[in-house]
Amino acid sequence: EMCIRDRLKLSATALQNVISREKIKRVLVFGKEFQKEAEDNTQLQPGTDLWNAVSRYEERLKEQGLFDFDDLLIEALCLLLEDNEEARSFCSRFSYLLVDEFQDISPLQYELICQWNRYGKELFVIGDPDQSIYGFRGSDSACFSRFLEDAPEAEVISLHKNYRSSGTI
């Protein structure tokens, strides 16, 4: 509806992806490379139809007391970043954290995982950076290299045989 009314040449899905990238950019600094990339790729300029559509979207969410998926992640991250007993207690409840399909997480989700696991004993991440398919939704396979930078003691176990499908597939 907003896309049509604002004469945007974007589908609702494309608009949602723009909104998601902008929210992440406002909240998170995922290394200088990510922030630079986010700034270079910004599509929001004050006064444009796109700016107006995003602003109306945010206003409607607020008016109706709603959260989109990014808002839920951002709110969870903000709660975990608080330096209080509640946040420490929550993070301490989990000694082991496993993240599957790690190649499909966003920088925001990466930061959430790190905060969630800050008192954990073990963090297991499973994925294949060569199979990242959700870049259009904000996932970034660079989270793998960031993980290895943040946890140089991590053991990497590579599987060299494809157990999912035969060679003909």
Regions picked out by a protein language model, each given a short descriptive name:
Residues 1-4:
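Short, small-residue-biased leader/transition segments that mark boundaries at the very start
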Residues 9-24, 47, 51:
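Short, well-structured alpha-helical segments
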Residues 23-27, 117:
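Short alpha-helix boundary/capping elements
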Residues 28-39:
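Short, charged amphipathic alpha-helical segments flanked by flexible coils
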Residues 42-146, 158-165:
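Conserved helicase NTPase motor core
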Residues 146-152:
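Short, conserved catalytic or adaptor-binding loops enriched in Gly and charged residues
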